[in-house]
Amino acid sequence: SQSLDVKEATGKLDWNESGLAALARADLGTAGRVDARLNSPDPPRFGLPDRGDFRLSADRLDAALFNPILTDALSLTGSLSGTAAGKLLPRSQLDAAGEVRLSGGVLSLKDEKAHVTVQAEKAQLRWAWRDKTLNGDLDLRLAQHGTLAADFRLPVPARLPAAVDGAGLVQLAVRAEMREKGLLSAVFPGLVQESRGRLDLSGAVSGTWDNPKGNGTLKVGQAGATLPAMGIQVSDVTMEARFEDREIRVTSFRAVSGPGSIEGSGTLRLRDREIHHIEARLSGERFQTVRLPELEMLASPDLTFEGAPKALKVRGSIVIPDLLIRGGEKRAVVRPSKDVVIVGESLEKEKNRPIPVDMEVRVVLGDRAFVKAEGVDARLEGDVLVTASSLDAMKATGEIRL
């Protein structure tokens, strides 16, 4: 719970036939100060007067006071200052403008697995509310993480109580230049380390409130990370995407690991603000997927993805040009005279909310696939067909020979 320590509060209200004069002040100590003023020439009545002017100001208001209205995982600290001033008009209409500034702001996002903290060098919102629209602009600058700017025009008529006009026109423009420095590492501790990258976004929304249409571009560059569980470093990650109305088109994607790389492209179609259909392709040559003491592997995938997220069809092949399996445990090894054949090997795991997928992918071993274990030093060859109806119930059929 958030406590509020009011050091001093004063108020004055004088409403007679000559008009209304009201004034209120509150000193919250270290939590800031609030001042409010309202004047009107109208005589006394129930409710707000039809005419008048008002001004509300806040100075160094503790941003933590607003945490109760945020989600449990989100918290804000810093000092908020701002003003709101305007006129009262007949029929509960308004003509007002103002701004809000955040200084020394720190935004924290915390859940059971991660805690992310971002410091804001500058955060300013300016707005004007008159006639049939609420418009304004946002300027956000994050320490070490880039900038975001937005201009908006929303169909919210300037009257009380406020309500959105669903048939009214919407205009929104967003520009962002963000730098990722360790945020992914904080969100996925242990899984991702030394994450980095740059994101450039330019987007716009038009249409009506009930039927908005978006378009823009997204670029990711200079990105990379270390994946300790796989023992690899992914670098030179780039991506370009365009989004328009109900479609997101990834025109290019590329990532480097070890001696090779992967690249891809695809299209995501949206319905009811969710992904409805996927079409994508991923290919590569000698991409380092694992580099651990017990296992090293390069992969050359050629895969296609098509369908709805809950009925995704995966087809293609993965060539393993380099594979080295090292054995560290001493155990009895039985070697057949000619080869070892694996047929119908089940990869089923414990079922827990299975993710449906229609998979048929052939995995082919290249010329440099070896096993070096206690009592075994041999080359592997062969291929298997991996099929699945869900990601937790895969099956491989074929043969791998020593």
Task: Tell me the role of every PLM-derived stretch.
Residues 1-402:
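Interface amphipathic segments
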